[in-house]
Amino acid sequence: MGVDIVDVSSGGNLHNAPIKAVPGFQIPFAEAIRAKAGIPTTAVGLITEAKQADEIVSSGKADAVFLARAMIRNPRWAMAAAEELGVKIDWPLQFDRGRTLN
């Protein structure tokens, strides 16, 4: 038994915490834990753009990104991100017919 991946977040529970909530503000925490502990991490914190998420993973700052607000705003975010990045993915059959309408 062990840990497969660590979801790194500063929590955001204190209104007066000295951390500014700007796009990617939690990434340095994930990057530091990944480097020092040698364990895969996920990055969170106002990650909203496909290229931003791709850069985080491809540069080794984190092994994955977790999205909340972006997925609430657009439940098909992953499909749109794949298209933006030129990655061909299989769409769920339920969505496939709607893909060509836009």
Where are these regions (language model features)?
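Flavin-dependent oxidoreductase catalytic cores
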Residues: M1-N102
